[in-house]
């Protein structure tokens, strides 16, 4: 399991905000705190059926997702995140996001290993 923190610009309808993100290979999906959803003015949708998300010390029920836009290495990337009240971080980038964009973590050196910018942009097509 790897954990890395990095500040990234998030683009919302209301404004652009630098957000401290946790890149977490142990989390299958991405999660966002409701306060950040409101601050950015993000679009959300109700899940057809609430899901229970397991956390390190228990679990929580989630009923909404948010469409998120992030800038990484000069490229705009899309993500979908569970809106999770009581989240300890503002944003957690999970394994689905990391795999989709072929992002690797180097926890020992605390850095992200990104594909070439051209290849990262091709994933969006």
Each language-model region and where it sits:
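Aspartyl protease catalytic core from the pepsin/retropepsin fold
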Residues: 1-22, 58-108
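A short acidic Gly-Thr/Ser loop motif
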Residues: 22-28
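A short local loop/turn or secondary-structure capping micro-motif enriched for an aromatic residue
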Residues: 27, 86-89, 121-124
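Cysteine-centered loop/knuckle micro-motif
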Residues: 30-32
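A compact, surface-exposed functional segment
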Residues: 34-69
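Short, surface-exposed beta-strand-loop junctions and turns on beta-sheet-rich folds
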Residues: 38-39, 99, 118-122
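Charged phosphate-binding loop/patch that engages nucleotide di/tri-phosphates or the phosphate backbone
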Residues: 108-125
């Amino acid at each position: 399991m790897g954990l890395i923190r990095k500040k990234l610009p998030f683009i919302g309808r209301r404004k652009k905000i630098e957000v401290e993100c946790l890149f977490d290979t142990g989390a299958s999906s991405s999660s966002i705190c409701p306060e950040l959803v409101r601050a950015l003015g993000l679009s959300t949708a109700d899940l057809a059926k609430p899901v229970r998300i397991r956390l390190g010390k228990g679990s929580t029920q989630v009923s909404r997702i948010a469409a998120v836009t992030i800038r990484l290495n000069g490229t705009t990337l899309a993500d979908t995140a569970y809106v999770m009240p009581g989240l300890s971080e503002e944003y957690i980038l999970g394994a689905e996001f990391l795999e989709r964009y072929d992002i690797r973590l180097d926890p020992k050196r605390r850095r992200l290993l990104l594909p070439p910018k051209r290849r990262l942009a091709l994933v969006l097509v």
